[in-house]
Amino acid sequence: MGFRNIQAFNLAVLAKQGWRILSSPNSLMARVFKAKYFPYDDFLNSKKGGSPSYVWRSIHNSLGVIKKGTRWRVGNGRRIHIWDDKWLPTPSSYKVVSPQLDFGDYPMVSSLIDNDTMWWKVEVVRSIFLPFDASSILKIPLNYNLPEDSLIWIGNKKGVFTIKSAYHIALSLVDF
């Protein structure tokens, strides 16, 4: 795997550490960084902070790679913002393309799920979204147990984070 851009490779390796924070939130590394740098938020919405360590600053710099290479898998919908997050199974953007409607202060996907039936609120979905988006949403299967939402890697076909797939994403983000 001959690397032509060391900056993109470095971002990919750092993104692997960021992916570890996301995929193993109970690991010692994830808990230490969370306690110090994002105690009230999650890694994807974290800020660099006032005087960050070199390690944190470096990992935080890889957030662009992680954000571009992930999308949400719907569980209970509590962590997924309807308009801002990537959560639809549409590879073009993974985001809702329907015009944004006033849906409260912070509209979450959970507001589209009926807690009694553990299924989509079909009429609400059809009334809010364009037919294309509504169809995509209603095709997303929901687990009856409504587990936590989870991030999945979309950087390759297998859905597994690799430095190679992160490198290709980093190449598109790095200024030459």
What are these regions (language model features)?
Residues M1-F176:
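A helix-boundary/hinge signal
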